[in-house]
């Protein structure tokens, strides 16, 4: 009986110690009793006992033991040194600068004005960059600047210019023309950069429309321009000024050498028109009583004395006549001034 119990125990122990075959028939290397070859282990460079070569480390210039070349350091700019590059320079370096020939405001968005008769540049207000002041309060420079426009040459680049504006060098804009050659600005057609003009202007070259973008535009000139609206023509080519907005009233003083503006008549009699610095001779327009008389040239018409209410023709010369008056004939045509 004992031998039978011992045989059963031996058989049970043999069955318990015999390893069971794998479920899928493939040896599992991770099993502790598996006879499969171990999996290849990849060397871990980060392990302290690993024999793998270390990973390539990128040189860090900021590391104290690095052999990499140092990074280029940007020069530190002191707060008091900003804007020194764009300070004003005399137009004529060989003589003392006394006349207001060159005016600049550094580190501002105001356009630069270079000319012989510019003495005041108001701060921007409502988008207006500046207004040319009255030049009669200051004497003409010596030597005078050449002109062939009937007025005074002006140049309107941006506020960052690497050279003074002069008839010999022109104007070089540092912001818009960094890699180009120095740009010579034609004095017969002064120019200024802008990026906000989206109106139609009448310039010296005619009516040209611009739709924005940083481009060089012909300067809008005139002393009687009140509001720059689409189709507005300059009444007199006696001054040049930059325009950055079309919603501000412009008032430009009259320069020496031009006729004064005729006084506004308060009676029914018409007033004779004034000169217009125009390249072409114009004819007198019809001057019906009460309206504005004048042609489209240097001459101005005369309004009628009395009669029924009428409206005169449009003219650049002068405004004559009262509200009531008879139809009057055209006034005398004034001779055009000699062109320079």
Swiss-Prot record:
Region annotation (Disordered) ranges: 13-96, 254-340
Presence of the UniProt keyword Nucleotide-binding in the record: no
Composition-biased stretches (Basic residues): 308-326
Biased composition (Pro residues): 35-73
Sequence repeats: 27-43, 59-75
Alphabetic keyword roster: Repeat
Gly residues: bias regions: 287-307
Stretches for region 2 X 17 AA repeats: 27-75
Highest taxon of the lineage: Viruses
Regions annotated as coiled coil: none
Official protein name in the record: Latency-related protein 1
